[in-house]
Regions:
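An acidic, low-aromatic, low-complexity terminal/linker signal
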Residues: 1-161
Length: 161
């Protein structure tokens, strides 16, 4: 898969989200968090890290940690396919610093523009993903998708077992 650059433009009447698949479930992440989408590459494993931390990749001389969201969210394991890819995202920390991290996902689908009317609060009942990891639930083309708060998902990741 060729490297794809993602435009970082917000729309005045809404926000853009990248639609992605994890174990046949569809999620969205804010496009402004996405720095790059690349095909699956070899990941160098790191010792003594949680199972969801796959290791690191070297992206043009920068070492970036790789997290498998399927494992982090305790979703069904799926084999990598030609559509499996890595999304490089910028994670913002409470101290205003930021880190680049890479996410293994089953596939990316499209970028959609959502207005506030398209997004509803996260319900209080249990689900595959912790409620504090979700910005809201979006209605897209007749389907409901969870919009992930990547900062919450990846901030404070326990790197050691």
């Amino acid at each position: 898969m060729a490297t794809q650059s993602v435009s970082n433009g917000a729309v005045s009447n809404g926000k853009k989200y990248l639609s992605l698949f994890l174990s046949k479930e569809e999620y969205g992440i804010e496009i402004l968090k996405v720095r790059e989408i690349i095909g699956m590459v070899d990941v160098t494993p790191l010792p003594r890290t949680p199972q969801f931390v796959k290791g690191v990749i070297n992206l043009r001389g920068k070492i970036i940690p790789v997290v498998d969201l399927r494992i982090k969210f305790q979703l069904a394991s799926t084999a990598n396919t030609d559509l499996t890819c890595i999304i490089v995202v910028q994670v913002n920390h409470p101290d205003k610093s930021h880190t680049l991290m890479a996410l293994v996902v089953d596939a990316v689908e499209e970028v959609v523009n959502l207005t506030e009317a398209d997004i509803e609060p996260t319900p209080d009942f249990g689900g595959a993903v912790q409620a504090d990891y979700i910005l809201g639930m979006a209605k897209i083309k007749g389907q409901v998708k969870a919009l992930l708060d990547i900062d919450a998902v990846l901030h404070g990741v326990e790197w050691k077992k």
